[in-house]
């Protein structure tokens, strides 16, 4: 006879452990347990049955895998947590005795420091694994880099996050790894490609951040501690892979003056390298030197091949290699107009590095300098200027510099009379930069709004700058990661390209009907107002609360004589009566014809005769309805030949496509009304 199993020794009760049991088993406090789980990447699990997993009568809410907690028993961080607890007790004892100096000494010299290097190596055995988990790290660190310092967020943490983020941005600028960017309500999205891995992160706008009390900053600070260590490892590996020293030189004074990216100086790892910011020009010079050496070698090889009579075969091989080594990216176009939109390849590093290379930009005071500087430098621009108010590190602070080719402006077009006058500079300040009056256009310079930079990057080419001139209505700024699907709405395409057959005509007819109905309502309303006014006039003629005063005998005789004169009006009254009867008959027949036309589905004109245009519209509507009916019958015929599973799948697809087409039709009708209103 088998042994009876005890309850809670197998199954879900053995595989799961509650949070209280885990804290007791590890012998640490609950905040330390949370920190340890964040560092090690252990998170709560949801069992199939909480009642079976719980060993008590009341089912608990938080469960962990028993094996995960068993794995944490051998973690070296547990000893650090216990040492911190012991030092905290000693500090509390010293403060209780009034020994403030001893408490400060214990906190400074004996407080254990946590090192997460071994945790990073355990969680990310390869560098690709670390790159795949870099999205959340960058988003959180960029968020803390833009937060104001307070009791919850110390200044040291903010400075560390800013330094790591700027170092990562310098790598993207040097290697031209940035690919796309998008302006959203939440912030600015960036996407970079590093060693074949797409990394996307979010950077908040530089508004004044208000720190709320409902945010648990202890949990976020734990993530910041882990992610700063991770990004430090990643930056070191990235800088080493391109031959740069890490960390780069950092100028504290320049950073205090608002230089940001310009406060860092990159230098190579070779012994004879001079500290400098490595740019694309340096790599081009080294590559040109290698080309000169290779040309000499190639000339000697050509002589040997020519003497051997193999020059013809060599020419064929070189032709093949030149065809294969072309750096242009192929564009995939669908073979049929109804086919799906094919995904296009992204920009290469050389193309991204030369997009803004030949230009010199000047950023106005009202434009966001930090994201624009990062984007322009990441896509090849070496000369970026801005006003001295925005900080150090500019190529030029003079707005009238003739070398400037593009100026980024984000202010409305105002008349010159409303602009303030520029105060005259002091005579002793002879070296002051010349100020330009707001709204002044310098000849030979292209003025654009900031969205032009983002749209050029997402399109992979320079778009028309006249569409982004100051004061112009900007084109729609669409997400580069959402591609227009078949049957969906595309804001960039015109209405004629997206409308279905006969959709525009039907929309015009419906608009005309709505206008006619509105006119009829206005006419009836005006008629009712006129009738009410006439009734009020009749009421005003009555006296003393609506009672008429009895007239005298003379008045009665006069009224009787007038009635006798008005009794016979000749043949005019008979003609008016016949005319009113004819009008009633015409209205009755017109109403009958309207009912017949409505039953037949045809438009009806008030004059009783259908015009040629209305006949054409009616025939076109009939053709469209017949075509739709034929397509529906064909689909029903095909569904009859399908199995039940495939038929259900087809119905789901048709339902989703119908919903998508309805949403697209709503957006098209809205756009049609807006364009019609703008045309008026």
Swiss-Prot record:
The UniProt entry lists the main location of this chain as: nucleus
Residue segments, region Disordered: 310-330, 472-680
What's an example of a GO molecular-function annotation for this chain?
Answer: ribonucleoprotein complex binding
InterPro entries per record: BRCT_dom (IPR001357), BRCT_dom_sf (IPR036420), PES (IPR010613)
Coiled-coil residue windows: 496-523, 613-680
Alphabetized, the UniProt keywords read:
Coiled coil, Nucleus, Ribosome biogenesis, rRNA processing
**Entry keyword Cytoplasm:** no
Q: Where is the composition biased (Basic and acidic residues)?
A: 519-529, 586-596, 629-639
Where does this protein reside within or beyond the cell? Nucleus, Nucleolus; Nucleus, Nucleoplasm
Composition-biased stretches, type Basic residues, lie in 616-628
Biased region (Acidic residues) positions are: 497-518, 530-543, 551-585
Annotated BRCT domain residues: 351-470
What's a GO cellular component annotated to this UniProt protein? PeBoW complex
GO biological processes:
maturation of 5.8S rRNA from tricistronic rRNA transcript (SSU-rRNA, 5.8S rRNA, LSU-rRNA); maturation of LSU-rRNA from tricistronic rRNA transcript (SSU-rRNA, 5.8S rRNA, LSU-rRNA)
HAMAP family documented for this protein? Pescadillo
What is the documented function of this protein? Component of the NOP7 complex, which is required for maturation of the 25S and 5.8S ribosomal RNAs and formation of the 60S ribosome.
Q: Which family does it belong to?
A: Belongs to the pescadillo family.
Please describe the quaternary structure of this protein. Answer: Component of the NOP7 complex, composed of erb1, nop7 and ytm1. The complex is held together by erb1, which interacts with nop7 via its N-terminal domain and with ytm1 via a high-affinity interaction between the seven-bladed beta-propeller domains of the 2 proteins. The NOP7 complex associates with the 66S pre-ribosome.
What is this protein's name?
Answer: Pescadillo homolog
Species in which this protein is naturally found: Aspergillus clavatus (strain ATCC 1007 / CBS 513.65 / DSM 816 / NCTC 3887 / NRRL 1 / QM 1276 / 107)
């Amino acid at each position: 006879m088998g042994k009876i199993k005890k309850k809670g020794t197998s199954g879900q009760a053995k595989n799961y452990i509650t949070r209280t049991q885990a804290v007791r088993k590890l012998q640490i406090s609950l905040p330390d347990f949370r920190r340890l789980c964040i560092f090690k990447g252990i998170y709560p699990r949801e069992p199939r049955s909480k009642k079976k997993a719980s060993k008590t009568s009341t089912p608990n809410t938080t469960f962990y895998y028993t094996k995960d907690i068993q794995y944490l028993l051998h973690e070296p961080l547990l000893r650090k947590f216990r040492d911190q607890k012991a030092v905290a007790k000693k500090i509390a004892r010293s403060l209780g005795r009034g020994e403030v100096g001893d408490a400060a000494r214990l906190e400074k010299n004996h407080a254990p420091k946590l090192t997460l290097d071994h945790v990073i190596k355990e969680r990310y055995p390869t560098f690709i694994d670390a790159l795949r988990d870099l999205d959340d790290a960058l988003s959180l660190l960029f968020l803390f880099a833009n937060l104001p310092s307070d009791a919850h967020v110390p200044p040291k943490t903010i400075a560390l996050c800013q330094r790591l983020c700027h170092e990562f941005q310098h790598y993207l600028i040097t290697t031209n790894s940035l690919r796309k960017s998008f302006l959203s309500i939440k912030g600015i999205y960036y996407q970079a490609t590093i060693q074949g891995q797409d990394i996307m992160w979010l950077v908040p706008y530089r508004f004044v951040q208000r720190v709320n009390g409902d945010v648990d900053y202890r949990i976020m600070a734990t993530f910041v501690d882990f992610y700063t260590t991770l990004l430090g490892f990643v930056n070191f590996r990235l800088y080493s892979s391109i031959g740069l020293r890490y960390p780069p030189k950092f100028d504290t004074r320049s950073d205090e003056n608002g230089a940001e990216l310009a406060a860092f100086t990159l230098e190579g790892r070779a012994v004879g390298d001079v500290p400098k910011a490595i740019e694309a020009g340096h790599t081009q010079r080294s590559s040109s030197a290698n080309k000169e050496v290779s040309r000499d070698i190639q000339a000697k090889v050509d002589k040997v091949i020519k003497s051997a009579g193999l020059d013809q075969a060599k020419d064929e091989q070189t032709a093949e290699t030149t065809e294969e080594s072309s750096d242009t990216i192929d564009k995939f176009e669908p073979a049929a107009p109804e086919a799906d939109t094919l995904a296009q390849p992204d920009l290469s590093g050389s193309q991204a590095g030369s997009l803004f290379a030949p230009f010199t930009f000047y950023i106005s005071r009202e434009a966001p300098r930090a994201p624009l500087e990062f984007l322009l430098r990441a896509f090849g621009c070496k000369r970026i200027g801005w006003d001295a108010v925005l900080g150090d590190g500019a190529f030029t602070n003079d707005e009238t510099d003739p070398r400037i080719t593009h100026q980024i402006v984000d202010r409305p077009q105002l008349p010159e009379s409303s602009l303030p006058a520029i105060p005259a500079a002091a005579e002793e300040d002879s070296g002051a930069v010349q100020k330009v009056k707001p709204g002044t256009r310098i000849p030979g310079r292209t003025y654009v709004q900031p969205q032009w930079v983002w749209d050029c990057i997402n399109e992979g080419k320079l778009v028309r700058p006249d569409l982004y001139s100051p004061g112009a209505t900007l084109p729609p700024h669409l997400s580069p990661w959402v591609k227009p699907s078949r049957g969906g709405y595309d804001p960039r395409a015109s209405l004629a390209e997206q409308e279905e057959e006969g959709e525009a005509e039907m929309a015009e007819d419906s608009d005309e009907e709505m206008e006619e109905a509105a006119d009829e309502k206005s006419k009836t309303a005006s008629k009712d107002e006129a009738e009410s006014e006439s009734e009020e006039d009749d009421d005003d003629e009555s006296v003393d609360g609506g009672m008429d005063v009895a007239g005298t005998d003379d008045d009665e005789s006069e009224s009787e004589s007038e009635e006798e004169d008005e009794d016979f009006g000749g043949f005019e009254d008979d003609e008016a009566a016949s005319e009113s009867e004819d009008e009633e008959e015409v209205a009755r027949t017109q109403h009958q014809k309207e009912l017949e036309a409505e039953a037949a589905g045809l438009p009806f004109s008030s004059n009783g005769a259908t015009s040629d245009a209305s006949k054409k519209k009616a025939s076109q509507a009939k053709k469209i309805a017949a075509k739709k009916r034929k397509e529906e019958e064909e689909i029903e015929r095909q569904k009859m030949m399908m199995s039940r599973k495939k038929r259900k799948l087809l119905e789901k697809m048709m339902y989703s496509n119908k919903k998508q087409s309805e949403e697209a039709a709503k957006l098209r009708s809205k756009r049609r009304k807006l364009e019609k209103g703008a045309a008026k």
